[in-house]
Amino acid sequence: MPTVGLFNQEGKQVGDIQLNANVFEVEVNKHALHQVVVALLANKRQGTQSAKTRTEVRGGGIKPWRQKGTGRARQGSIRAPQWIKGGIVFAPKPRDYRVSIPKSMRRVAMKSALTSKVNDGQMVVLESLSFEAPKTKQFIEMLSAFNAKKTLIITAESNEAVYKSARNIQGVSVIPVNNINVYDLLKFEKLIITKDAVSKIEEVYA
């Protein structure tokens, strides 16, 4: 079983914690990671883009000038694509970009992302994380103790004081463990997670 240090909010190690090898010590599957990240980003797209083709643009029903004898290039409609205010060739239309990923692949990707954080030494486990009131200064001091800059912080439950303490800090995101996803794990350089959140992850993915 992989073992990592257990720290308090001040950045001092208070012990060690053993992680479940079925979650934090698996073979990293880069293909699954890629597939899941692509799907997550695709599913975020609104798909509301739209433009008019030459058949949908208003006007242009009459030939702008006769075919021959003017010395100008022949034209059939002022709404042809080459005209200003003309239609768009292969105009984008609203569409659904949603991609479906099998549950088994999502689980493999999640375990791979968590394992990569442990392997890279970028995972910090906190004994607990709580603030009586939102305190950005204290939060910054905690991050400095772990030399954390671009950081994802995962808590066991939604904590308003913790969230408000971090929301104005650039490159830092706080999410409850129920909202964890592969993209965020890979996007942020360091992962700071509470002991209770680790237990919840192991319950679901072990």
Curated annotation (Swiss-Prot):
Keywords: Ribonucleoprotein, Ribosomal protein, RNA-binding, rRNA-binding. One of its GO terms (molecular function) is rRNA binding. Residues 49-76 are annotated as: Disordered. Pfam families: Ribosomal_L4. GO terms for biological process: translation. One of its GO terms (cellular component) is ribonucleoprotein complex. It comes from the Bacteria. Belongs to the universal ribosomal protein uL4 family. Part of the 50S ribosomal subunit. PANTHER family: 50S RIBOSOMAL PROTEIN L4 (PTHR10746), LARGE RIBOSOMAL SUBUNIT PROTEIN UL4M (PTHR10746:SF6). One of the primary rRNA binding proteins, this protein initially binds near the 5'-end of the 23S rRNA. It is important during the early stages of 50S assembly. It makes multiple contacts with different domains of the 23S rRNA in the assembled 50S subunit and ribosome. Forms part of the polypeptide exit tunnel. HAMAP family: Ribosomal_uL4_B. This is Large ribosomal subunit protein uL4. It comes from Clostridium botulinum (strain Eklund 17B / Type B). The lineage of its organism: Bacteria, Bacillati, Bacillota, Clostridia, Eubacteriales.
